[in-house]
């Protein structure tokens, strides 16, 4: 998959650039990052986050970077306790780059000489910082732009707040402008659903066969994937089936296939992280909590201008429904 391959190739290059060059004395700035337990290289959430962090470190070689991938939540908890208890003399920052780490941060006291940021959570952690990039507006817009398709919301699991918000946004946007149906599939019962590439392929193969045989089915399919690291399994299946379409997710995947991907919902965590890290370097305190939505630069829906299925103009649909999606997101936030 091209969108995955590009980022996967860039990460080692950026990583090689961090920490290189002559250093006369140890840096007093230390940046530690716990990436998600599903790692990187899937072309989605973790990759965009990691790309931003490595780019920042390349621009600021005086910052010492410790990039860690805990084996599981329990391992992450031990690493967090060790970091919080360190008696370092420099300026330290820790980024918990997944909302699956909420449980290990909750109730922890602030470190004496550092700061902690956890990504993609709407919870507040006293003494620490958090932010969330809201997907409701972008998902509503995606649903409206999918008006000519039968929609399938494909979730990695049930009960994840960010996934449920996106699913609700897509469903509401689609139903507001379309007579086609929206279905929901769920891959797994827990977080393991975010790292099941092979199982995703088999699941979709079986479900679509059943779907096409259903008497109630009529129309062209479009997947709205909320799968994390399992997303490549869906792309693997769609690569060989020209009658199924898929929304790009997290990064711009429109180059995957102009006949398959009508648009991409892009989450620009690298831009949000750059803002936080630059504030850290300048000594500016981090807010306790921040939220960003469709009107910010941190989430956007990118139309595939090459998409030519039945002469659908994704750019025109984006322009038609964008303002309405912004208003719907504000209404949702006020609920």
Task: Name the predicted role of every residue range.
Residues 15-17:
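C-terminal motif of bacterial Sec signal peptides marking the signal peptidase cleavage site
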Residues 19-21:
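Bacterial signal peptide processing site
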Residues 109-134, 251-258:
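Flexible loop/hinge segments that line or gate small-molecule binding clefts
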Residues 53, 138-187, 287-310:
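An alpha-beta-alpha
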Residues 275-335:
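Hinge/cleft segment of the Venus flytrap/periplasmic-binding protein
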Residues 31-52, 56, 60, 67-73, ...:
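Extracytoplasmic "Venus flytrap"
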Residues 130-152, 265-283:
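Hydrophobic alpha-helical segments within soluble ligand-binding/sensing domains
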Residues 33-34, 88-99, 119, 216-228, ...:
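Periplasmic-binding protein-like
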């Amino acid at each position: 998959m091209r969108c995955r391959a590009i980022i996967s190739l860039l990460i080692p290059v950026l990583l090689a650039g961090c920490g290189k060059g002559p250093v006369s004395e140890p840096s007093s700035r230390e940046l530690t990052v716990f990436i998600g337990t599903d790692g990187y290289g899937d072309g989605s959430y973790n990759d965009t986050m990691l790309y931003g962090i490595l780019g920042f470190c390349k621009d600021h070689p005086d910052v010492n970077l410790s990039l860690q991938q805990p084996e599981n939540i329990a391992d992450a908890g031990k690493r967090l306790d060790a970091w919080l208890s360190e008696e370092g003399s420099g300026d330290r920052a820790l980024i918990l780059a997944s909302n699956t780490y909420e449980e290990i941060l909750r109730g922890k006291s602030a470190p004496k000489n550092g700061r902690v940021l956890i990504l993609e959570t709407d919870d507040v952690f006293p003494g620490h910082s958090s932010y969330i990039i809201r997907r409701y507006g972008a998902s509503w817009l995606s649903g409206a732009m999918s008006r000519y398709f039968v929609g399938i919301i494909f979730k990695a699991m049930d009960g994840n707040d960010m996934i449920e918000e996106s699913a609700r946004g897509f469903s509401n946007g689609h139903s507001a402008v379309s007579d086609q149906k929206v279905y929901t599939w769920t891959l797994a019962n827990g977080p393991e659903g975010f790292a099941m590439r092979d199982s995703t392929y088999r699941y979709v193969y079986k479900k679509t066969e059943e779907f096409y045989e259903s008497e109630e089915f009529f129309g062209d399919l479009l997947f709205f994937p909320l799968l994390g690291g399992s997303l490549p399994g869906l792309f693997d299946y769609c690569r060989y089936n020209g009658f199924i379409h898929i929304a790009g997710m997290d990064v711009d995947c429109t180059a995957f296939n102009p006949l398959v991907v009508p648009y991409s919902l892009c989450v620009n965590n690298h831009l949000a992280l750059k803002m936080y890290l630059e504030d850290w370097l300048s000594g500016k305190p981090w807010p306790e909590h921040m939220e960003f939505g469709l009107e910010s630069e941190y989430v956007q829906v990118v139309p595939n201008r090459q998409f030519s299925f039945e002469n659908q103009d994704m750019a025109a649909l984006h322009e038609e429904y964008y303002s309405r999606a912004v208003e719907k997101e504000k209404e949702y936030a006020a609920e």
